[in-house]
């Protein structure tokens, strides 16, 4: 992901030696804790019962850009080794693209030279690097009092109803709405027992974001966040505030009236999710990402044998997630945090010149 001042690039494959990330543009002096970073990566493993049986330790190795516990201002390179890999089954299905996966278009794009094992470079395994990049962005935002929190808004047809205040104070790492969370677990369990999978929605809220970040057209922070979220494997929809729900309202209902509170300009409602004209308003920035069900399931599916050019039935074997959405929470947080951090650095550069 390339911002104007802050960027990261991912490398590695699901069944390669390692995955990793190169983060560029970080200011010097940001305090770094490997233990904190490990905890962020641990969150990415999700709920064990519904996650893949592949067990990775996810030990980050910082290769450059950090000295004596602080960023140096030069590029930060971090790798995480893949230690629990079983590629044998993928040799059996290399000519039969898995429905819902990137196998077929990837084979066409790379003329058959792509690493197809476990999805290769298209695998969700690469989100390890996103979480690492997001960790550094979050540390930068901490200095400004900005926090990004995400929770399970929906799993299947079960939806949670959570206020921003509840999200900040909750100790449940997945969803502050305890009743809804219990129903979500049941929904995931039903899919698991059926050999199937289920999707869902992650809602992220960024608190204490100052007004004025972003801009029109190419500077649009909403567009940048949407772009970052769509880069996450399995994301098929993004909306801010009420999103598509705004299409059902009249302007008198949709508009967020401006009022004064403790001497500050705020809005009575936050239907637009803290963004107007591509710029932050100072209200909590609210965004949701919709995740499709995991395409790897244990039920028979139709596909084509590309070697024989005939339709066949594919019944997958392997180690699959019945629901990837809980694992996506830190990935969504990281993506949102990284974009906000980039826009914050841009704003600070302007302030330095204007003032």
Curated annotation (Swiss-Prot):
Pfam families: Chorismate_synt. PROSITE patterns: CHORISMATE_SYNTHASE_1 (PS00787), CHORISMATE_SYNTHASE_2 (PS00788). One of its GO terms (cellular component) is cytosol. Pathway: Metabolic intermediate biosynthesis; chorismate biosynthesis; chorismate from D-erythrose 4-phosphate and phosphoenolpyruvate: step 7/7. Keywords: Amino-acid biosynthesis, Aromatic amino acid biosynthesis, FAD, Flavoprotein, FMN, Lyase, NADP. NADP(+) binds at residues 44, 49. This is Chorismate synthase. It comes from Thermococcus kodakarensis (strain ATCC BAA-918 / JCM 12380 / KOD1) (Pyrococcus kodakaraensis (strain KOD1)).
């Amino acid at each position: 992901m390339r911002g104007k001042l802050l960027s990261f690039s991912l490398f590695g494959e699901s069944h390669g030696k390692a995955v990793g990330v190169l983060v560029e543009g970080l200011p010097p002096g940001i305090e770094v804790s490997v233990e904190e970073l490990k905890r962020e990566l641990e969150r990415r493993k999700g709920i064990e019962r519904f996650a893949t049986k592949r067990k990775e330790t996810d030990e980050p190795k910082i290769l450059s850009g950090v000295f004596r516990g602080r960023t140096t201002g030069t590029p930060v390179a971090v790798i995480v080794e893949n230690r629990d890999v079983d590629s044998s089954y993928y040799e059996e299905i290399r000519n039969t693209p898995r429905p819902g996966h990137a196998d077929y278009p990837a084979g066409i794009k790379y003329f058959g030279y792509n690493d197809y094992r476990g999805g290769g470079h298209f695998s969700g395994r690469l989100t390890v690097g996103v979480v690492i990049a997001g960790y550094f962005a979050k540390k930068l935002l901490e200095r400004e009092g900005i926090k990004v929190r995400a929770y399970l808004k929906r799993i299947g047809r079960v939806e949670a109803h959570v206020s921003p205040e509840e999200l900040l104070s909750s100790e449940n790492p997945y969803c502050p709405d305890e009743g809804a969370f219990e129903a979500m677990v049941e929904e995931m369990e039903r899919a698991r027992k059926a050999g199937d999978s289920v999707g869902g929605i992650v809602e992220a809220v960024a608190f204490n974001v100052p007004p004025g970040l972003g801009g029109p057209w190419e500077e649009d922070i909403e567009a940048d966040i949407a772009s970052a979220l769509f880069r996450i494997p399995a994301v098929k929809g993004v909306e801010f505030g009420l999103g598509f729900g705004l299409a059902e309202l009249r302007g008198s209902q949709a508009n967020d009236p401006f009022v004064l509170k403790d001497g500050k300009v705020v809005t009575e409602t936050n239907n637009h999710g803290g963004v107007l004209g591509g710029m932050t308003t100072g209200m909590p920035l609210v965004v949701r990402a919709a995740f499709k069900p995991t395409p790897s399931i244990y039920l028979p599916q139709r596909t084509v044998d590309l070697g024989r050019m005939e339709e066949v039935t594919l019944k997958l074997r392997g180690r699959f997630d019945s629901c990837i959405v809980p694992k996506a929470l830190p990935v969504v947080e990281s993506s949102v945090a990284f974009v906000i951090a980039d826009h914050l650095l841009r704003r600070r550069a302007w302030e330095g010149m204007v003032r």
